[in-house]
């Protein structure tokens, strides 16, 4: 089945569910229409350099995380054939009728794994025009063998190992950090893969496929198999810039926890996805997270206590604060809640 050949019954009822928010449409049009978005070239890190020119490769990665908060990696070790197979499985499951996605255990996942729209949205600017499967790494396997499910698990494992390697490089790359530096310990129980689909959005200015946000993890890895449908944008120098899709690379971005741990050396950059008026977009994202009890505190060898920009907090405390803010305001406030200077 071609990607543009789908039954509209597979789409979540976004327009009818959130019609009460569309009184804000004129303001969204004006806000988005005033933004001139240029296309950017993200820094590209060839991970083959870790074997051939290790120090140069590590320095390039540290520079990209500091200056951009985003970078692409090539020769990352995740087979392209596996990523294509994941994309095909992703397209197939999102093609299923909406009612099946919300009620049945597709691919052996509970219906609660399927999410769509933004239930907490209080205005149109907070609505994400998307649907997704949120898949924790430790999700129990189904009793029957499902090839697509096995592919998801293979990709999750490969992404977890890659993300751990990249996070360690960045942690050890901070000024004053050495081989004895204490690392933030990650846990499979809190890491997850998210399969995204952004349906076509017929609103005048397209709308947000995913609202502007930063990631609440240590590190995120994103892949998009399509090379013809863009949409990912990040904030650079006070302006939104568009990221050109590249199926052969993986996009890596710094999360809030790594920004806090690095004492603002690395940047968790605000980013968003713009929905397309006529084309659907698919992507995959892996989120590297620590245990809920892990203490995030910028007081390791590279930071004196008096110079710390944040008070110490656990990942569990951070998540709880975010959920409270989203419930009360409709949006995430994030690191500002924990900043001391």
Curated annotation (Swiss-Prot):
Cofactor(s) required, per the database record: L-ascorbate; Fe(2+)
Gene Ontology CC: one annotated term: cytoplasm
Residues bound to 2-oxoglutarate: 198, 281, 283
Tissue: Expressed in roots, leaves, culms, leaf sheaths and young panicles.
Keyword Iron: yes
EC number: 1.14.11.13
UniProt pathway: Plant hormone biosynthesis; gibberellin biosynthesis
EC class (word): oxidoreductase
Name of one Pfam family that matches: 2OG-FeII_Oxy
GO terms, molecular function: gibberellin 2-beta-dioxygenase activity; metal ion binding
Cell compartments where the protein resides: Cytoplasm; Nucleus
Keywords from the UniProt entry: Cytoplasm, Dioxygenase, Iron, Metal-binding, Nucleus, Oxidoreductase
Catalysed reaction equations from the record: gibberellin A1 + 2-oxoglutarate + O2 = gibberellin A8 + succinate + CO2
GO biological process terms, semicolon-separated: gibberellic acid homeostasis; gibberellin biosynthetic process; gibberellin catabolic process
Domain Fe2OG dioxygenase: 187-290
TM stretches of this protein: none
InterPro entries: DIOX_N, IPNS-like_FE2OG_OXY, IPNS-like_sf, Iron_ascorbate_oxido_reductase, Oxoglu/Fe-dep_dioxygenase_dom
Amino-acid positions noted as binding Fe cation in the UniProt annotation, renumbered to this chain: 213, 215, 271
Cofactor binding note from Swiss-Prot or TrEMBL: Binds 1 Fe(2+) ion per subunit.
PANTHER family per the UniProt record, alphabetical: 2-OXOGLUTARATE (2OG) AND FE(II)-DEPENDENT OXYGENASE SUPERFAMILY PROTEIN-RELATED (PTHR47990)
Record family assignment: Belongs to the iron/ascorbate-dependent oxidoreductase family. GA2OX subfamily.
Note: Plant overexpressing GA2OX5 exhibit an extremely dwarf phenotype.
Function (record text): Catalyzes the 2-beta-hydroxylation of several biologically active gibberellins (GAs), leading to the homeostatic regulation of their endogenous level. Catabolism of GAs plays a central role in plant development. In vitro, converts GA12 and GA53 to the corresponding 2-beta-hydroxylated products GA110 and GA97, respectively.
Protein name: Gibberellin 2-beta-dioxygenase 5
